[in-house]
């Protein structure tokens, strides 16, 4: 197990999403998203969906089911992964319909699905053209937050702020 408490007595391990929420860094109401909760979610302090809605606002719909990536599952058992993928595709379309039905995204707007897991991001990226209208854009929650807080050119600004000791430093 982790030995942080022995190396750094009194230290606290916290997920970046929960840390940002604790510091009051949110997007409240700046967009609508699908959220894919990884099978092994890093968010441990409260229900992950509660954390995600607190960070992103109420325009978030949870996309149920495994993405089919599951570490090496897609490589080792593509037969199983493909079946999982078909079920996830149905869930993505349901979520898309819900977002569009609530008027949270336009009829032809792309749908964004956010996650916190590298394997899931890879898996979700495979669904790019599987929505009914528009494309599915997959990304990390923290990347979407950086993009909206820092702008489209967030990367150079992000690096500069991190180098100057800003809150972004914890993400590097």
Q: What are the functions of these language-model segments?
A:
Residues 1-172:
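Iron-sulfur cluster-binding electron-transfer modules in prokaryotic oxidoreductases
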């Amino acid at each position: 197990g982790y030995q942080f408490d022995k190396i750094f007595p009194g230290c606290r391990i916290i997920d970046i999403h929960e840390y940002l929420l604790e510091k009051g860094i949110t997007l409240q109401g700046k967009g609508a998203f699908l959220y894919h909760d990884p099978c092994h979610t890093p968010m441990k302090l409260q229900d992950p969906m509660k954390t995600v809605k607190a960070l992103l606002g109420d325009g978030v719909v949870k996309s149920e089911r495994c993405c089919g990536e599951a570490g090496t599952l897609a490589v080792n058992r593509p037969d199983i992964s493909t079946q999982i993928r078909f079920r996830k595709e149905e869930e993505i379309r349901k979520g898309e319909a819900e977002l569009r039905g609530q008027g949270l995204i336009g009829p032809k707007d792309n749908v964004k699905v956010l996650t916190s897991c590298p394997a899931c991001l890879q898996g979700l990226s495979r669904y790019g053209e599987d929505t009914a209208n528009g494309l599915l854009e997959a990304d990390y929650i923290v990347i979407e937050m950086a993009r909206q807080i820092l702008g489209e050119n967030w990367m150079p600004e992000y690096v500069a702020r991190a180098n100057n000791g800003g809150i972004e430093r914890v993400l590097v």
